[in-house]
A protein has these predicted regions:
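Compositionally biased terminal segments of proteins
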Residues: 1-169
Length: 169
């Protein structure tokens, strides 16, 4: 039952990502922990992973999620992934398997993908522009994240402009 789930920890994230990598799952980390991977720390209680909406992806994801303490993923039917709806796995902590995030899919967001090294663990996530595309709801936390992401993108663009007008030729 979801109300008995504890917040996901950084160690939970690392264990999950390690398993996703070992199972060769096509995934993109999104949500609060993706922001964390980019250096923005805010409270989050779950792990959000965007994956392709295919049965093959479902098989790999289910196998990868079997590292979770309560093995709640054993009840996942890989055929559900063809339906395109998001899947909430309420284990010791919550993992949201996203097939759609604000109208964006794995296919539409993979162009924004990048790999972040977190303590030697390679995590596939999306850049700030991609994250901004997943934060287009009216939820308070998404509006706050959107403001931070928009400002961060402005700063990066200003840095690029100053580099372009710098020394050298």
């Amino acid at each position: 039952m979801e109300e008995y789930c504890r917040p996901a920890t950084l160690e939970d994230l690392k264990a999950l990502i390690t398993s996703l990598n070992q199972q060769e799952v096509d995934y993109l980390l999104i949500g609060g922990y993706a922001l964390f991977a980019h250096g923005y720390h805010r409270a989050t209680t779950d792990i959000d992973v965007l994956v392709p909406a295919t049965e093959e992806s479902g098989r790999k994801v289910r196998k990868a999620l079997m590292v979770l303490p309560d093995q709640a993923a054993k009840d996942i039917d890989p055929a559900w992934f063809n339906e395109g709806g998001n899947i909430r796995v309420a284990d010791a902590f919550v993992v949201d398997i996203m097939l759609n995030a604000c109208g964006e899919t794995y296919e539409t967001l993979k162009q924004y993908s990048e790999t972040v090294d977190m303590d030697g663990l390679l995590i596939r996530t999306i850049n700030l522009e991609g994250l901004l595309r997943t934060k287009q709801t009216m939820r308070d936390k998404d509006m706050a994240d959107r403001a931070v992401l928009e400002r961060a993108l402005e700063v990066l663009q200003e840095r690029e402009k100053s580099r372009d007008h710098g020394f050298g030729g």
